[in-house]
């Protein structure tokens, strides 16, 4: 099945995402369902331009990391980073609202994008470890609720983590490109009332 081979990708190759593949993913987003056809969000594309790379670097080094299991915590210690935000293409779902209806629509839309991307051979990595208003203000939006990295994995890891270095100094780690979450939720497929 499509998702059986899927990995959460956090480490990316330099291979560019082909325009026709990005167009296909965007078309699938355009066609995804929305409650009462409201579509109270927009999808922004962060590519490899200088301005976009600056935002992605800020996301990685300053905004989405976790220290002691707290996003953006200050202090000493090794941090867990979120390499999904360094993908060659990062899609961002932005909205003026911060309510459940909009977030549910964004979840449907972003999952549609993930499935479309995986279907055509792209690797993907969701990231929701962010503060929606802070990120929104950084890019001129009210809120950003979800990020999805698209590209090609540099490799599939056999180890669960990789060390992260900046200027030769170990800063922390990130999960490797491997299957995460497989068979963790054992509550799927229960029939009601049986």
Regions found by a protein language model. Give the residues of each.
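Acidic, surface-exposed loops and disordered segments
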Residues: 1-194
């Amino acid at each position: 099945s499509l998702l059986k081979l899927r990995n959460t990708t956090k480490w990316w190759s330099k291979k560019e995402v082909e325009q026709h593949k990005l167009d296909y993913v965007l078309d699938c987003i355009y066609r995804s369902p929305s409650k009462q056809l409201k579509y109270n969000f927009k999808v922004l594309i962060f590519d490899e331009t200088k301005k976009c790379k600056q935002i992605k670097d800020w996301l990685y080094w300053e905004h989405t990391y976790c220290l002691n299991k707290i996003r953006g915590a200050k202090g000493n210690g090794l941090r867990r980073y979120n390499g999904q935000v360094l993908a060659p293409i990062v899609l961002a779902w932005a909205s003026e609202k911060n309510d459940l209806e909009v977030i549910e629509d964004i979840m449907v839309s972003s999952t549609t994008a993930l499935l479309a991307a995986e279907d055509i051979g792209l690797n993907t990595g969701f990231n929701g470890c962010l503060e929606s208003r802070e990120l929104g203000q950084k890019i001129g939006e009210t809120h950003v609720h979800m990020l999805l990295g698209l590209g090609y994995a540099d490799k599939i890891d056999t180890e669960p983590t990789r060390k992260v270095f900046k200027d030769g100094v170990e800063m922390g780690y990130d999960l490797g490109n491997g299957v995460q979450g497989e068979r963790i939720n054992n509550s799927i497929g229960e029939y009601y009332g049986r």
